[in-house]
């Protein structure tokens, strides 16, 4: 087991946290206290999470397979959708399987390294999802508002670069959060009021006097979300202004059908995630934190395949072609 370095131990002593209430050794593991200790409730939680996880995996893998194999779906729009589906598959896999196992085995512990790794991937994928949703809104803007320039500007090289930048932004943000959080002393506090290692709940374990750096990182991450939200909002303002000028009702309806799913996904993910990160952890009931986190962790990856494919004629046609005559 690794021990506190000298600076961490001094910080704990200075802030009065190395009393008999807390250990003076480094936290070696955390305990996830998200759901009730009742066996019946844990079984229900595990069953619900398993069904939701299964639906999310099947739905997102189906989109990945269809957009990869079908020649009619080799367009920028479906390239971005394929990336989003792969990301959602990874995003829900970071938290849900561990939570299911914990409920079934009564073992809520997670190692210090495992917690840091889970927090990194969660922040990485959440940031990447925001970036990809922003890129997809720009793609819709170009396709609807600048159709004559669309194929020239949104070419294969541009698509690859935008995706690379999206994934890179997630990695950078994930590293920044994890390094800023896990380099600070927990001073023996190791019970997380959540079903996974979430940064806001981890911050509540730290002394307020030593989290200045992490607050700066949180402000940076929030700024990225605000910028993305502004870009998405402006894109759709232009898109809707163009759609309303389309003379035929059928043309407006068809164009709206390509935009509404993306707008619903953006609203679900960004609003729920923003509320969870902006509201003060200490002033909210633990059950509210857990259910809000469950919402933005589970709902978007599960509903995205349904939202994007339920009314999408191209996806339905691709499924029929792949399944045979």
Swiss-Prot record:
One of its GO terms (cellular component) is plasma membrane. It is found in: Cell membrane. Signal peptide: none annotated. Gene3D superfamilies: Rhodopsin 7-helix transmembrane proteins. PROSITE patterns: G_PROTEIN_RECEP_F1_1 (PS00237), G_PROTEIN_RECEP_F1_2 (PS50262). Its main location: membrane. InterPro entries: GPCR_Rhodpsn, GPCR_Rhodpsn_7TM, Olfact_rcpt, Olfactory_GPCR. One of its GO terms (molecular function) is G protein-coupled receptor activity. Residues 1-43, 94-117, 173-214, 277-289 are extracellular. It is a multi-pass membrane protein. The chain crosses the membrane at residues 44-64, 73-93, 118-138, 152-172, 215-235, 256-276, 290-310. The keyword Cell membrane applies. Residues 65-72, 139-151, 236-255, 311-325 are cytoplasmic. Keywords: Cell membrane, G-protein coupled receptor, Membrane, Olfaction, Receptor, Sensory transduction, Transducer, Transmembrane, Transmembrane helix. It comes from the Eukaryota. Belongs to the G-protein coupled receptor 1 family. Odorant receptor. This is Olfactory receptor 14L1. The lineage of its organism: Eukaryota, Metazoa, Chordata, Craniata, Vertebrata.
